[in-house]
Amino acid sequence: MANSKFEYVKQFEQPDSLLPNTWIVVRLDGRGFTKFSTKYAFEKPNDKRALDLMNAAARSVMSELPDITIAYGVSDEYSFVFHKSCTLFERRASKLVSTIVSTFTAYYIHHWPTYFVDGPPLSPPLPSFDGRAVCYPSVQNLRDYMSWRQVDCHINNLYNTTFWALINQGGMDGTAAELMLKGTFSADKNEILFKKFGINYNNEPEMFKKGSVVFRNYELVEPGTKKVSEEEAEEMSSSAVPEVKSKSQVEKDKKVRTKAKIVVEHLDIIRDEFWERRPWLLSGTPGKVPKEP
């Protein structure tokens, strides 16, 4: 910016760099998606096209931003995780959130015709998302956050599956279905599904029950193999002085990440096994790219 008498306005800008040496999670949510899903006749309780579209947009975001370690999505929300050592945009919250949200929204609209082939084209108001950034100081905090989202997915999906079965197959209206489910537990909902409608909840698609996890796929580590453990990752990433990699190492890691395939899986991310078999998610160091068959 050229020097001028107007340059003083820069003094009003507020620094918004996020805490150093903490995991950054940028979570986005659809704005007004209840009306949006009605407008485009999303299937209830789950529309596979809509979920596949969300996953495609998330993959595209991760492809454009190698700094993202892992992402998790369910319904109209997605969480993107940056490693503690991330220095992208000098860790400025406004830059990170706006980049994630705008890139995701752009790809959501871009991929729409691929997944909603027979439906009407998008028209205003167009789909949009809001976002926020939260810092988590430890690996356990991060894992608890991810577990919270997946548990929330299960609870909501079981309720919605039962609720819409009562409406679509049981002939109830929304008020009656809601009243019937009031105060019920998971076992009660499973019993309603099975006894009334012959639905075994365990046979529902994994994506509906567990959500979607997106990450770069490297060679899996066998349980018990000596790699970077969670405790070691915790110790390395929680030191008072954040690790600073050389420029050459940063470039090397970036090249490895671009070679890795970005996958969408529907796995249990609460259990230790998921993380133990993919130590690169916590260590911040890329794994070994699988050989092509």
UniProtKB/Swiss-Prot annotation:
Cofactor detail note: Binds 2 magnesium ions per subunit.
Residue numbers binding Mg(2+) 1: D29, G30, D76
Pfam families with a match to the protein in the record: Thg1 (PF04446), Thg1C (PF14413)
Catalyses which reaction(s): a 5'-end ribonucleotide-tRNA(His) + GTP + ATP + H2O = a 5'-end phospho-guanosine-ribonucleotide-tRNA(His) + AMP + 2 diphosphate + H(+)
Single GO term (MF): GTP binding
Amino-acid positions noted as binding GTP in the UniProt annotation, renumbered to this chain: D29, G30, R31, G32, F33, T34, S75, D76
InterPro entries documented for this protein: Thg1_C_dom, tRNAHis_GuaTrfase_cat, tRNAHis_GuaTrfase_Thg1, tRNAHis_GuaTrfase_Thg1_sf
Cofactor requirement: Mg(2+)
Superkingdom, taxonomy of origin: Eukaryota
Cystines in this chain: none
GO BP annotations listed: tRNA modification; tRNA processing
Region called Disordered, residue ranges: 226-252
The keyword Nucleotidyltransferase is annotated on this UniProt entry: yes
Enzyme class: transferase
Annotated keywords: GTP-binding, Magnesium, Metal-binding, Nucleotide-binding, Nucleotidyltransferase, Transferase, tRNA processing
Residues where Mg(2+) 2 binds: D29, D76
EC number: 2.7.7.79
Task performed by this protein: Adds a GMP to the 5'-end of tRNA(His) after transcription and RNase P cleavage.
Family named by the database record: Belongs to the tRNA(His) guanylyltransferase family.
Name under which the protein is recorded: tRNA(His) guanylyltransferase
